């Protein structure tokens, strides 16, 4: 599953 940092990058 994607990491928290990846989530921020998507935003």
UniProtKB/Swiss-Prot annotation:
Domain of life, per UniProt, equals Eukaryota
Quick check: keyword Lyase in the entry? no
| UniProt GO cellular component terms | extracellular region; synapse
Location of this chain's protein in the cell: Secreted
Methionine amide is found on 11
What are the alphabetically sorted keywords of the record?
Amidation, Neuropeptide, Neurotransmitter, Secreted
Q: Which residues form the signal peptide?
A: none
Which GO terms fall under biological process for this protein? chemical synaptic transmission; neuropeptide signaling pathway; tachykinin receptor signaling pathway
Q: Which family does it belong to?
A: Belongs to the tachykinin family.
Q: What does this protein do?
A: Tachykinins are active peptides which excite neurons, evoke behavioral responses, are potent vasodilators and secretagogues, and contract (directly or indirectly) many smooth muscles.
List the protein's name: Substance P
